[in-house]
Amino acid sequence: MNGEDQIQKAYESILGHDFEKAIEWFEKAIAAEPDNAAYHYKLSITFARSNKLFQAVEHASKALDLERDNEVYRYHLQVLHARELVDRAQKEISAKSEHGERAIFLLKEAIVLDPLAIEAYLILGEVFALRNDYSRAYQVVMDALRLEPNHELAKQQAARYQLKLKL
């Protein structure tokens, strides 16, 4: 069985909602053709959808190493790095670090890497709100709403922060 046949089996597994089996098929395709950047990229996407961020980054990096000029692979890796930063920021917040400075830095960096990362905007708004900086919290959440106008949580946060600003 060649790599393309295994990729086809991986897609069949995805359609059957068996992501672990899909990962196995992608890995077999890579074993057959280790220098095929597209296979690493496809496996990375599947890992990312399965919340296996470390492995997703690993294969996205490999895909980009194999095809340095591929902007799709570069953007995908940036999005994954943004997700890593959001995860790290959430850990900082959970640890209740002093005023969330590190979390703010990480979230802003995540937004630079992936300007469409709505979650990063919403968490950043919460961090500002925790510091009683409702003006910045409101501003950040409004940025999120400009990206996704019907996002319910963003609407709720914006209303809450706007109310706090009036008090």
Where are these regions (language model features)?
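Alpha-helical segment of the N-proximal tetratricopeptide repeat
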Residues: 2-32, 84-109, 113
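Helix-start (N-cap) detector for alpha-helical repeat units in TPR-like alpha-solenoids
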Residues: 2-4, 37-38, 71, 78, ...
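Structural motif corresponding to the intra-repeat A-B loop/turn of tetratricopeptide repeats
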Residues: 16, 50, 95-97, 131, ...
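Conserved structural position within tetratricopeptide repeats
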Residues: 28-31, 62-65, 108-112, 143-146, ...
